[in-house]
């Protein structure tokens, strides 16, 4: 019995030492922090738009920085958005809707009133419905043989409920199942994405009414409404606003709601001392490891890996570039 007990103690010590010797898996945030400088891509200032809301109740500024989508996606709407910002059209307008777990929307509170509506700048285009998607852009193959990676050729989900999904140049995309020239890509409605409000089809929206997703990703909107970008800084100013008490979360002044004024919306070229930003390249090995860690948490808090992740649960890391 003494020998049996001795063997048991030795086995226990061996198991304990083995557990201590095993490397601790990194959490996603640790993988991002350890990513080499070469793995980050600078965001062009020309792709940034800045919205300043009125200060909060304590007088603190509320700035929201939006990164606009690159070609070939949504360029008709983005062209309109650039013209609206250049004309300072949103200045003095407001956040008009905050629908819990859905969207925060801003624009002209009198936009539905033909008499009171603010005149739009000249040169805005009407964008066709087929522009909700674009010819497929593809993605470079990345594999990490040391991990059970579900990230190859940019693809993230082979069992996504809505579409094949992938990342491309820092953006989450859906992809059609077509082969060859018929294949299409489109941006998807993840948290923080910015879209174009519209009326019933065939209306596609001008870009004067914008919204951002503040809740669970409403992927049913993909290819039904245009997306023009995403919020990369200041998202807390949009998600924490009081919810509207009117229909669909619109602010109802008769019910005591107060709209949040917009002080200014500017393209980055007009904003003094705007920080520079960069994103973790979705073509990098660091992002591959990060995506795998989001899908399969192995860091000490977790008991078992989930075995997968929705594309919107793998947000692309964005940070300020240190001066």
Region locations from a protein language model:
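Bacterial N-terminal signal peptides
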Residues: 6-15
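Positively charged n-region of N-terminal signal peptides that target proteins for export
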Residues: 1-4
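Cyclophilin-like peptidyl-prolyl cis-trans isomerases
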Residues: 17-323
